[in-house]
């Protein structure tokens, strides 16, 4: 398949691995006991790494830390409870992406709410939800707007369309979050040793490569934005390792075929019209992070489901036995969690990292 097979070429992969091996052999201070730690921020990268066994092909002196770049994985239990309360209303059709259906809150999951009679539907875009609202004028249709900057443009454009069409029965629960403040929080805590970052490709397609420069300058960590194919990731690792060995600290872009310095400016304009930063947002396992989430601007407040239904915020503590938060910041591996593959598995996903198709625990379970 054109533009896919080229990025999975075994001979090219072998060449990149040999170059990496040669570099690491000349760095005796990096050993399996004291490895070079690279964080892949995005869950999509995590799955590519495990699906193609890249972690087993790399020198033993390179180790991955799995980052918080999966929006379902960092979804607080209290936010699920808000969604379930709204979905249970008889006048509501609740629309969500499929990954969010099985995430558990104190009140259960949206999948369980559907089984109990709530009208909960899986959609593939917010425009699908808007069409449902147009076709069901006697119902209140609520879309669960979830995701990083990757999904924010489609949500923003949908709300612009709803406003233009004067749709009165369409609302959103806003759970969109931003990547740069999250990485600021992670690095400022200094709890985990990270030598370099594989930055997410899809988010960067929207925000561009420029926003990472502040992180690079402040924390003196190199970043390489990368795509999602095996050769993308191997080339990005080579670029990161080269920077570290040469004692450089830069933002480099391996994913130039998709990502540009300033990102998608039309998408950014739509986002800035519809959304504004919140003072603080809660993340599962990470707590409150300043300016890491968004809410609707004044011109779009009429579409806010939580305002319309007068929802009260929920604070729900995570299970103390679960180590989702530690996995998210790289303090432990999924297999170190006492629930992994026992109480928590894909058929009975107790933690959000096992629910999502991008979760590190799901990747470990499926490929290890």
Stretches found by the model and what they are:
Residues 173, 191-260:
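A conserved active-site cap/scaffold subdomain adjacent to cofactor or substrate pockets
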Residues 176-183, 263-266:
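Short, conserved secondary-structure transition motifs
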């Amino acid at each position: 398949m054109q533009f896919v097979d080229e990025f999975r070429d075994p001979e090219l992969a072998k060449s990149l691995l040999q170059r990496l091996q040669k570099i690491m052999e000349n760095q005796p201070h990096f050993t399996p006991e004291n490895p070079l730690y690279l964080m892949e921020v995005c869950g999509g990268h995590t799955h590519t790494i495990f699906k193609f066994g890249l972690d087993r092909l790399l020198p033993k002196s390179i180790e991955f830390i799995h980052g918080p770049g999966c929006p379902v994985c960092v979804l607080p239990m209290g936010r699920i409870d808000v969604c379930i309360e709204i979905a249970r209303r008889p006048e509501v059709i609740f629309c969500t992406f499929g990954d969010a259906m099985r995430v558990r809150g104190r009140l259960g999951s949206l999948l369980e709410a559907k089984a109990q009679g709530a009208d909960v539907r899986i959609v593939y875009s917010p425009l699908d939800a808007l069409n449902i609202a147009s076709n069901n004028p006697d119902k209140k249709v609520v879309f669960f707007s979830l995701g990083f900057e990757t999904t924010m443009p489609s949500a923003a454009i949908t709300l612009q369309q709803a406003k233009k069409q004067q749709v009165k029965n369409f609302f959103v629960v806003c759970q969109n979050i931003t990547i740069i403040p999250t990485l600021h929080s992670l690095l400022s805590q200094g709890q985990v040793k990270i030598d370099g970052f594989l930055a997410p490709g899809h988010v960067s397609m929207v925000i561009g490569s420029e926003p990472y420069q502040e992180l690079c300058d402040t924390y003196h960590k190199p970043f390489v934005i990368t795509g999602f194919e095996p050769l993308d990731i191997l080339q990005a690792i080579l670029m990161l390792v080269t920077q570290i060995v040469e004692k450089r600290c830069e933002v480099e872009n391996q994913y130039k075929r998709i990502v540009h310095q300033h990102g998608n400016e039309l998408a950014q304009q739509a986002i800035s019209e519809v959304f504004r930063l919140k003072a603080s947002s809660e993340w599962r396992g990470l707590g409150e992070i300043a300016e890491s989430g968004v809410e609707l601007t004044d011109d779009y407040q009429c579409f806010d489901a939580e305002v319309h239904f007068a929802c009260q915020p929920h604070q729900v503590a995570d299970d103390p036995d679960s180590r989702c938060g530690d996995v998210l910041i790289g303090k432990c591996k999924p297999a170190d969690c006492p629930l992994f593959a026992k109480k928590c598995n894909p058929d009975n996903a107790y933690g959000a990292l096992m629910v999502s198709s991008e979760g590190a625990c799901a990747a470990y379970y499926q490929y290890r």
